[in-house]
Amino acid sequence: LYEAGFAVLSEESGRTGPDGEVAPTHVVVVDPLDGSTNAALGLPWCATALCLVSNGVPTVAMVANLRTGTRYTAVLGGGAQRNGHPIIAGSMERLEDAIIAVNARPPATFRPAQYRSMGATALDIASVAAVGGFHGTIDFDEDRIGVWDYLAAITIVREAGGVAADALGRDLITLDHNARRRPVTAASQGLLDELLAAGRSS
């Protein structure tokens, strides 16, 4: 990537570029192993996530399950795919009917139809992009999620017609290695609004 003139942003190395310099135009945000605890335990919910950010805009994204080979991809303006087939987010509107992936323990007042804590943020979010996956995701933790954990996945969700926001209203698109966010995603705006309300009250 450096030889091609791309900078790289990852949790382990920070933001680096060719010959140690940061390339300002194209940055690849990468998480080589999302869900490392799951991987160590042999659980089939871990992934590699990549997102190309050009001039501050996410343009190409991929989240690949390292155990099953399932691959979610998206190109800006070109929609989203799973294993090469077009996908769209579902139409779930109500939290009480939804199955939600959560990060950290939810409060007792959080009452979707069901929730799961799967341990791999990128895969949790990417699954929202396709009917049959989670209806939404929410992070109840205190700002521990880095951009490498979610940027590729929210790009895929948005291209599939889903929606994403930060629980505290901040921009999710950042190339600051020290920035942390609380991403919330959903198949529909109505469900996102309910999830954001739940996040604010936690």
Q: Where would I find each of the regions flagged by the language model?
A:
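Residue-level signal for inorganic ion chemistry
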Residues: 1, 36, 65, 74, ...
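N-terminal subdomain of lithium-sensitive/metallo-dependent phosphomonoesterases centered on the IMPase/IPPase/PAP
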Residues: 1-33, 196-200
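Short coil/turn connectors at secondary-structure junctions
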Residues: 4, 22-25, 42, 55-59, ...
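General beta-strand structural signal in soluble alpha/beta enzymes
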Residues: 7-12, 30, 39, 117-119, ...
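Well-ordered beta-strand scaffold positions
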Residues: 13, 78, 85-86
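DPxDG-like acidic metal-binding loop motif
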Residues: 21-77, 81
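An extended, acidic
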Residues: 87-202
